[in-house]
Amino acid sequence: MRLLKSNSLLRLVNSYLVDSPQPGNLSYMWNFGSLLAVCLVIQILTGCFLAMHYTAHVDLAFNSVEHIMRDVNNGWLIRYTHANVASFFFIFVYCHIARGLYYGSFKEPRTLTWSIGVIILILMMAIAFLGYVLPFGQMSLWGATVITNLMSAIPVYGQDIVELIWGGFSVSNATLNRFFSLHYILPFLLAALAVAHMIALHVHGSGNPNGLNAGDDRFPMHPYFIFKDLVTIFAFLLVLSIFVCFYPNALGHSDNYIPANPMVTPASIVPEWYLLPFYAILRSIPNKLLGVIAMFGSLLILLVLPLTDLSRVRGNQFRPLMKLSFWFFVVDFIILMWIGAEHPASPYLEVGQIATAFYFAWFVFIVPAVGLFENTMADINKL
């Protein structure tokens, strides 16, 4: 312990992971940060090992993945761990964001922490999309074609941008090389942003379920919260091992086990399940450009939440009306996820349009309206 406080580098680690004061009433909802850190470490390690055996070539990529599965010692374990942890990564991120929305973690003085978190989410989605293309199965090829073609909606320069991304006039060897290079390097940028996220959080410390200033009611990170984090980490590793060993493809898509064929279009082109809500928003708007704007806007709108939440009370713990609207929002997000996996035909198209309208209305109208109503009622009760 003396070394932790005397060494300049270890002293920094000590201030973040050992002696960091945390509110005494933190629930298990505050454990997602440590779970996400574990996921990021697993993804970087397994990704590095996979890159040692992967070949970024349109004629060899699919076979190199099969080589990893069949010939590399424990290659199946590395690949299935990488694929399934990606899904758990997004499960934990969505839960982490939901906790932030519910407990008002986006409000001052933690707005910077929230903003960095939103940037991390967007970067995660980009990395996930790049990785989905690398096995170069049917869904990889056609998913890359459809998603990159969205850039063609940009006026004047759209098609030029698409061809710049492709490195040619279609998804080709140059595209696969670019995607592999970016998929390898961007997780390290993600790790840097995660450190920045933690530094920003460390300035004012964690919030708590009551939304109040914890004051002196704090305990050191170690051993109390470290062991609390270990409970959920071991639970996660247990569930992950069940998926990897018994249901490795439960969260994937069967069409990606068919080699990419530009002459045959799959019956349904869908991204991975964790991108489906935003894919549903994209498809719910008939105009291509407006659909692309709405899809990116559905992520960027999280940045304006600190401005639109006008309530004087932090979080929804003591706000029954806002608590109800929050659960409506969660249901709406699940509906969008369901719609994103369906064909864009009636009645799914109409349901998707209603769900998309509610998604944006929640941020722009419902959150500020409920906040103003609660503030007004509080002022009336004071009279």
Swiss-Prot record:
Provide GO CC annotations from the record: mitochondrial inner membrane; respiratory chain complex III
- Binding site residues for heme b b562: H82, H183
Domain of life the protein comes from:
Eukaryota
Any Pfam family the entry gives: Cytochrom_B_C
Give the UniProt subcellular location, in the record's own words. Mitochondrion inner membrane
Which GO molecular function annotations are given, in alphabetical order? metal ion binding; ubiquinol-cytochrome-c reductase activity
Q: Which family does it belong to?
A: Belongs to the cytochrome b family.
> What is the membrane topology here?
Multi-pass membrane protein
The residues listed in the UniProt record as binding a ubiquinone, with positions renumbered to this chain, are H202
Q: What is this protein called?
A: Cytochrome b
| Note, other | Heme 1 (or BL or b562) is low-potential and absorbs at about 562 nm, and heme 2 (or BH or b566) is high-potential and absorbs at about 566 nm.
Q: Which organism is it from?
A: Schizophyllum commune (Split gill fungus)
The protein's required cofactors: heme b
For heme b b566, which residues are the binding ones?
Answer: H96, H197
Main function: Component of the ubiquinol-cytochrome c reductase complex (complex III or cytochrome b-c1 complex) that is part of the mitochondrial respiratory chain. The b-c1 complex mediates electron transfer from ubiquinol to cytochrome c. Contributes to the generation of a proton gradient across the mitochondrial membrane that is then used for ATP synthesis.
* Quaternary context: Fungal cytochrome b-c1 complex contains 10 subunits; 3 respiratory subunits, 2 core proteins and 5 low-molecular weight proteins. Cytochrome b-c1 complex is a homodimer.
State which residue ranges cross the membrane: 32-52, 76-98, 113-133, 179-199, 225-245, 289-309, 321-341, 348-368
GO process annotations (BP): mitochondrial electron transport, ubiquinol to cytochrome c
What the record notes about the co-factor is: Binds 2 heme b groups non-covalently.
Query: PROSITE patterns in the record, alphabetically?
Result: CYTB_CTER, CYTB_NTER
Going by the UniProt record, its keywords in alphabetical order are: Electron transport, Heme, Iron, Membrane, Metal-binding, Mitochondrion, Mitochondrion inner membrane, Respiratory chain, Transmembrane, Transmembrane helix, Transport, Ubiquinone
